[in-house]
Amino acid sequence: MMEPEEYRERGREMVDYICQYLSTVRERRVTPDVQPGYLRAQLPESAPEDPDSWDSIFGDIERIIMPGVVHWQSPHMHAYYPALTSWPSLLGDMLADAINCLGFTWASSPACTELEMNVMDWLAKMLGLPEHFLHHHPSSQGGGVLQSTVSESTLIALLAARKNKILEMKTSEPDADESCLNARLVAYASDQAHSSVEKAGLISLVKMKFLPVDDNFSLRGEALQKAIEEDKQRGLVPVFVCATLGTTGVCAFDCLSELGPICAREGLWLHIDAAYAGTAFLCPEFRGFLKGIEYADSFTFNPSKWMMVHFDCTGFWVKDKYKLQQTFSVNPIYLRHANSGVATDFMHWQIPLSRRFRSVKLWFVIRSFGVKNLQAHVRHGTEMAKYFESLVRNDPSFEIPAKRHLGLVVFRLKGPNCLTENVLKEIAKAGRLFLIPATIQDKLIIRFTVTSQFTTRDDILRDWNLIRDAATLILSQHCTSQPSPRVGNLISQIRGARAWACGTSLQSVSGAGDDPVQARKIIKQPQRVGAGPMKRENGLHLETLLDPVDDCFSEEAPDATKHKLSSFLFSYLSVQTKKKTVRSLSCNSVPVSAQKPLPTEASVKNGGSSRVRIFSRFPEDMMMLKKSAFKKLIKFYSVPSFPECSSQCGLQLPCCPLQAMV
């Protein structure tokens, strides 16, 4: 058994380990390379009869636990909203866990209750919340409490709203059964609301309707008013609205200034879920999203996300604490005390009875950082997200389908959803960063959240390069396996194919003194302000042609083109007489030497399609190069990406030369 002196020694050892872990976490693989059940084989079938040594236990941290950990504190963890910690927070929980009080009533631990009340008032003022959410204000009958999660807070708010509405209905229908009254209740949220809102409706047996949002993914007053009127005509009783500030999918903000007056007029409980974005309201410049907050009956957010107070720690405020108490009050004799009814007993503000001393770590963090440093932390995360957004916008292969808010950027690879899905799969293989998908308007998107307080521009650039490399590989594979039939038509009509047939070398594209535009042209490029009209090529209006980057995204390309595309790329790489190092898909090798020369210019002029003539000169077995063989080819040999295209037109073509050159 461990004694105090050994605990002191082992405690130092553990603190050293934690410091080492958090200081070097960016060097670890973010996601583990394990399969479900990996731990079973590493543990004995039964618990030990005799105690293990601490050295054995401590050694198993790296041997057993860390190989299966997702490192949420890594700067390369971008999948979910943050779940940050900090040194003061860790110290706070160390003390709270040592005290280990269960502060269900004031009498069970006065410091637990009173510190929480004061810290929650601090936090409400820091966020700019209304005075009716304060414990200590002459005109307030509300206050704040720390819950375990926003999910639990939303359920508590819905249960309180349900109880209050049923009591109102009982005044006009005193003989009605409460279950019958409950069956008529209906609540509302946007279709972007968190899944916990749906779960709250299931638990409370209240119908939950998810309303459509506008083009900015925001729930507006018109949609809510229409739903209320329709439900009233059906005999339903509207009771509750959950407005989201910072949705999970795209960090959108519902319009409180429109929803609030409707809720006040119709007698609906307005609950605000600001789980992630709530921390941003520490900064005055982000409080525009709080316009209409005075109508809120309850408000919740997670300091355990972005405020560097580790899980669990959720702030929850109500305008009227008595509506909570009438919902959750049970008062057996063994929980009564001399100050019952005078002091605050938080057991009446929540579902469980027992509660942790969570306010210590929150108190430590606020005092250790101060408001100014917490604001600087939020601004830094937002600036890092802006930097990532700029990188995405400067790459024409990607698009940003929703406006960036705070530290979340959503983006996708242009084209069908399968491309974005495959990019995510490719990134997941290496585990060097962690991203997850979401969907908006049937489009698959990637969520990129700046999570760590230690994230730097170098971290962002490193992760962006990994994303772009994965996208380049996926686009190359897609163009190989599913070329668009329009690509071949364009190649046969535009004279750039003639340059290929004549054996144009890489050196003619990038050599000193050569004009890249003379060697090849882009099928279509973005039109700059003030730019002149596009040129005509072989009778074609180039501005009417589709962007080659978009043209390669056909999901229903004929199979007959696959072998020709593969063979052409193989031959193109094989005919270079003078080797030149180019950026490759998977290595820095150079193209292989030619086995046969390309046809001369004279032979090209003798009639027929130039594309057919090119392919006719190669051996039949080369023409039948399979998809699997081409994958091996691009694994071992360089495929040029011709980056100088971007310097001429601003369009970085991610695909093969077949799309890029004419």
Swiss-Prot record:
- Record InterPro entries: Aromatic_deC (IPR010977), PyrdxlP-dep_de-COase (IPR002129), PyrdxlP-dep_Trfase (IPR015424), PyrdxlP-dep_Trfase_major (IPR015421), PyrdxlP-dep_Trfase_small (IPR015422), Pyridoxal-P_BS (IPR021115)
Under which name does UniProt file this protein?
A: Histidine decarboxylase
Q: Which reaction does it catalyse?
A: L-histidine + H(+) = histamine + CO2
The family database entries (SUPFAM superfamilies) matched by this protein are listed as: PLP-dependent transferases
Where do the annotations place substrate binding? Answer: Y81, H194
Task: Write down which residues bear the modification named N6-(pyridoxal phosphate)lysine.
Answer: K305
- This protein's UniProt keywords: Catecholamine biosynthesis, Decarboxylase, Lyase, Pyridoxal phosphate
| Effect the entry attributes to changing E285K | In a colorectal cancer sample; somatic mutation
Indicate the enzyme's highest-level EC class. lyase
Tell me which CDD domains the record gives: DOPA_deC_like
Q: Which GO terms describe its biological process?
A: catecholamine biosynthetic process; histamine biosynthetic process; L-histidine catabolic process; L-histidine metabolic process
Q: State what changing S354G does.
A: Strongly decreases affinity for histidine. Strongly increases affinity for L-DOPA and confers enzyme activity toward L-DOPA
